[in-house]
Curated annotation (Swiss-Prot):
Subunit comment: Part of the 30S ribosomal subunit.
Native source species: Methanobrevibacter smithii (strain ATCC 35061 / DSM 861 / OCM 144 / PS)
Coiled coil ranges: none
Function: With S4 and S5 plays an important role in translational accuracy. Located at the interface of the 30S and 50S subunits.
Name of the molecule in the record: Small ribosomal subunit protein uS12
Family: Belongs to the universal ribosomal protein uS12 family.
An example molecular function term from Gene Ontology annotations: structural constituent of ribosome
Length: 141
């Protein structure tokens, strides 16, 4: 057992050992925010560069419809999933889209779409889900 007045040393040791924990280190140094294309924001606007089809991982067989987006705030490019049946038809090149996280574990990709961490939520300031359900028509810019 340590001595009666060893609390300061024990506490210091615990603080030093924290830095061996990968999760603590990533959070303390804010590495996730630094590597994040959205720079820690929940959503971001971008311009559609092209439409791409991404093959689903095994055992599924499908082509998931996605778009390449260039962010307005920093010029970084990323791939965003277009959720919904026929949603890709409402998105054209040079449209302004709002993207958000796709909702995978720890901010990562979800399901069978490899390497895609984002999804399109709005196209030209109109909700994509509303257009897919037929409630609203896509505005002409």
């Amino acid at each position: 057992m340590p001595g009666l007045f060893a609390a300061k040393k024990l506490k210091k040791n615990r603080q030093n050992f924290k830095w061996k924990d990968v999760d603590y280190k990533r959070k303390a140094l804010r590495l996730d925010v630094k590597a994040d294309p959205l720079e820690g924001a929940p959503q971001a606007r971008g311009i559609v560069i092209e439409k791409v089809g991404i093959e689903a991982k095994q055992p599924n067989s499908a082509i998931r419809k996605c778009v390449r987006v260039q962010l307005i705030k920093n010029g970084k490019q990323l791939t965003a999933f277009a959720p919904g049946d026929g949603a890709i038809g409402f998105i054209d090149e040079h449209d302004e889209v709002m993207i958000e996280g796709i909702g995978g574990p720890s901010g990562r990709s979800m399901g069978d779409i490899p390497g895609v961490r984002w999804k399109v939520s709005k196209v030209n300031n109109v909700a994509l889900s509303e257009m897919v359900s037929g409630k609203i028509e896509k505005p002409v810019r």
